Amino acid sequence: MWGQLPRLSGRRRRLQYPVMSSGNPSAPPAAEPVSALYDTRLPHLSRWRRMQIPLIAAAVIAVVRMLGPTLRFESLGLYFQQSHARGEAVISAFWHRCIISATWYWRNRGVVVMNTTNFDGQWTRRVIEHFGFGTAQGSSTRGGLRGLAVMARRLEEGFDSAFTIDGPRGPRYIAKPGPVMLARKTGRAIYVFHIGVEKALTLERAWDKMQIPHPFSRAVMVGAPLIFVSPDADAEELKRKHAEMQAALERVRDVAESWFGLSEEERQRLREELNAKV
């Protein structure tokens, strides 16, 4: 679980633009996807499945583009700005449940996302690259170490990375160790967040209970203080950091998903608490 990341050989690619910058949400997407940095061999797909990929991607893109501009976001706990102020990128982690709202919130900032090479991963890759994300092909079960190595290189170049931490297929709300491994390798901080929406359609039969926001819904992005992992961390320390990340993910989900049921006094108290050290 806590193996070493492989090295990447080859020429270092030039940084094209800073990422996850709160000041420029409409920066142009990268000219070259991060997946171009290494050989990614796709699993065999039937002709019918290959035909479905662009159709599904187009439908999802249309939904996100239709819903996204109508959402009214409030942002709390923007701790990633502490790393950005030092000129360092961060490693973000969030639950798959809020992937639609997260895609819109972090769009066009060059964030590099771990992406699987299976059928679902192929249409997902088209969607997230359309919205200005980079992709590193891999998952917890296939090609993950190679994907982490690509993300490590991009972090060094100034690009933030992100994990749907219980993906690609669950179990729901159980964090995988990728961000902790990457943080030990690179020295970059882990930033966990969750997005809650006031009104949404929940896909109850989906493994992740994905939420599709209703048009014009209010939404809140809640982040937690940064988590740092020493490059000398042993297996026990890595387990502790993994548990710390799991607890932080649960905390921000609880706050974000209960937010619109709280009184204004309770929300104001939480605003002050979450923003006190940002």
Predicted segments, located by residue:
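Non-catalytic C-terminal accessory region of glycerolipid acyltransferases
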Residues: 16-68, 130, 145-278
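A short, well-structured juxtamembrane/interface segment
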Residues: 65-89, 96-101
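Short amphipathic alpha-helical segments and helix-helix/interface helices
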Residues: 80-81, 103, 125, 179-180
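Short, flexible loop segments at the rims of nucleotide/cofactor-binding pockets, characterized by
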Residues: 67-72, 90-91, 138-142, 168-169
